Every structure is written in C-alpha cells, then in structure tokens.
Amino acid sequence: MSAEEISNPLAESGVTISSDSEQYSAPESASPQSPSSSSPAVVLYQPPTVWSLFRSAVINLFLPFVNGMMLGFGELFAHEAAFRLGWSNTKVFPVSRRDARPIGPGVEVVERPRRRVDLDDHLDELTSLE
C-alpha cells in the first residue's frame, strides 16, 4: 500500500459526495444558447408609473376614509337597533337631559334658570376688595 491510500480512509468507502461549489458542465443535449440569454432577467426594481402612484394613493388615502365612514355608520346602526329593540334599557339621551323638550330631530330646547341681577350690585361685587 502506498502512503496516499492510507491517509484518505474515505476513498475506500466508495461514497462520493459532490460539492455545492463545484462548477457543473452543461449537458450535451442542451440547446446551443446559453441559459442566461434564453431566460428573461429578473427585474428587482421598476420606477413608479402614474398608474402605480394613483393606485397607492387610493389605497393609502381613500380606503381609510371609507373604512372610517363604514365604522361610524355601523356604530350608529348598532346603537339605533339597540334602542329600538330595547336591549338593556338603552336610552338615546341621558337621564340628565329629560327635562328638555324636542323641537326637531336631534334638537332640544332646555330652559335655563335666569336670576335677575341688579347691575349696580353686580359691579359692586366685581370691584370690591374683600
């Protein structure tokens, strides 16, 4: 036995593992063109077009507005449904506003108590040093 055969014990096993970094040759049955010229190149960046800018503006500016409108109308609808069905004593107006009288849809008049203040007494209170 020679010194080269003793130093490499894996050569006797008969297992050959090819390296990933090995340069492979093209098979003979392949077309004469090189693979890089026959397949299109992968484009990683494309400059923005007017259509892509418009599309992204609609997505980022208009859709949140529509989403907020839908959420608002959904909340109004749910509150109205709860009021009309009488779920858990839902009231449209709080108890503190019961003394008001409605004059139109969503408009109420509340009487404010007014006390008569004598102008001279009022000025005396404002200008007193006590």
Curated annotation (Swiss-Prot):
Keyword match Signal: no
Record-linked Pfam families: TOM13
Key words, A-Z: Membrane, Mitochondrion, Mitochondrion outer membrane, Protein transport, Transport
GO cellular component: mitochondrial outer membrane
Ranges of compositional bias, category Polar residues: 15-24
InterPro entries reported for this sequence: OMP_MIM1/TOM13_mt (IPR013262)
Region (Disordered): 1-41
Biased composition (Low complexity): 25-41
Example of a GO biological process term: protein insertion into mitochondrial outer membrane
Key word Transport present: yes
Subcellular location: Mitochondrion outer membrane
Family (UniProt): Belongs to the MIM1 family.
Alphabetized PANTHER family for the sequence: MITOCHONDRIAL IMPORT PROTEIN 1
Function: Required for the assembly of the TOM (translocase of outer membrane) receptor complex, which is responsible for the recognition and translocation of cytosolically synthesized mitochondrial preproteins.
Identification of the protein by name: Mitochondrial import protein 1
